[in-house]
Amino acid sequence: MVETRHYDLQSVFAAAGEPGRFGKHASQLMELHRRICSLEAPLVLECGVHKGFSSGVLADACERVGGRLVSLDIVDCSDVITSDCWTFIQTDDTDQERVLREAPFLKEGIDLIFIDSWHSLRHVRRQLELWYPYVRQSGWLAFHDVDPTPYMRGQPDDNRDSEIVWRAIWQLVQDFFYANEDDLLLEYHLGDKGMAIMQKLAPMSKLPNFPRRIAPRHVSFYSLARRLRGRN
């Protein structure tokens, strides 16, 4: 049975589907819970722990179906939850050599990886490069905090720097998807700070294509002419 230190796990279960920011956050976590519970003895990797809000939900799902959860954080979060299925490793989640040395069973294939650690474009890109090859066919890669909208001007969490970083991560997720479109499905769950979920269709052994930015078009002669005529 999962025990949590900083919050009541049952409150997350109860809030799923409810209005408000916490309801949206709970719904996103319970979406991951549902997917884990659809598997038999899944292996789950969590990048970023903090107070264990996602850790408790993921561990509960793993306990129900005989799975295992490995959580990574540079801060000592070893006491945020207790669960027989949980392994915590205090490390940078891009130190793959150490992670695989301490949790070698991850080499068998990861069913779901939840990315919610250092929010920087370079770091998330590196996480994708390192861990995507270990995700099993039909497995999932979930990215928390991908929607820049809550940080935009006039929004509840108005913050220029966070808006810029979150938008870069949003774009990276799309760039990675379109570079590997034949091998992935992608869906978004908006609300709170947003979550993106990719499902991997390719065999575990297949390496991904490098993400490439598709340049957008912002103006054309036709749209410019319409503006000059006073039309939208």
Residue ranges of predicted features:
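A short alpha-helical cap/connector motif
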Residues: 1-114, 118-232
